[in-house]
From Swiss-Prot:
One Pfam entry name: Pur_DNA_glyco
Keywords tagged on the record: DNA damage, DNA repair, Hydrolase
Family classification: Belongs to the DNA glycosylase MPG family.
Biological processes annotated in GO: base-excision repair
Name the record gives this protein: Putative 3-methyladenine DNA glycosylase
EC number: 3.2.2.-
Protein origin, superkingdom: Bacteria
Disulfide pattern: none
Organism: Legionella pneumophila subsp. pneumophila (strain Philadelphia 1 / ATCC 33152 / DSM 7513)
GO molecular function terms attached to this record: alkylbase DNA N-glycosylase activity; DNA binding
Amino acid sequence: MRKLLRPFYERDTVLVAKELLGKYLVHHDGLEEKIGRIVEVEAYLGQHDLACHSSKGLTKRTKVMFGPAGYAYVYLIYGMYYCMNVVTEKEGIGSAVLIRALEPIKNIQDRTQGPGLLSKAMRIDSKLNHRDLLSNDFYIAEPNSPTDFTIIEKPRIGVHYAKEWANELLRFYIKDNPYISKT
């Protein structure tokens, strides 16, 4: 595996989202190394995207989104589930890619179909918020043998409040992969 470097994340959010598919999310939590293949993502395009957290402006919660690309943005939803995002583009944009589902590769026994489930299975929590994804214990890597697949584009899940942004085709997943989240 080859760890992705900062320039990968500093590009257009939609391009980064599509190119994250098939990559490996790696987390060594001090006990064991967990690896999952990214099979589903959603792109959030910055302050003008009404479904994006940064659309409300710079806050303590969203500060990481406005920082350098290649950092993790991890937040709690419904008071019980963590969601993991990858910050993209240049500083000040406020864009990110939500990791929605993983295919288990190593040391993952729990379900990974959905952002909360994958975070639980990978032991991702608020301690990893603002973590540099170029670290040695939490990163995304290119697999040694990439595989070909077809990318499906659909509207994002659970963003009906985002007006015209609710129907944008910004959810991407690997066609026919059994680990994509259920809608």
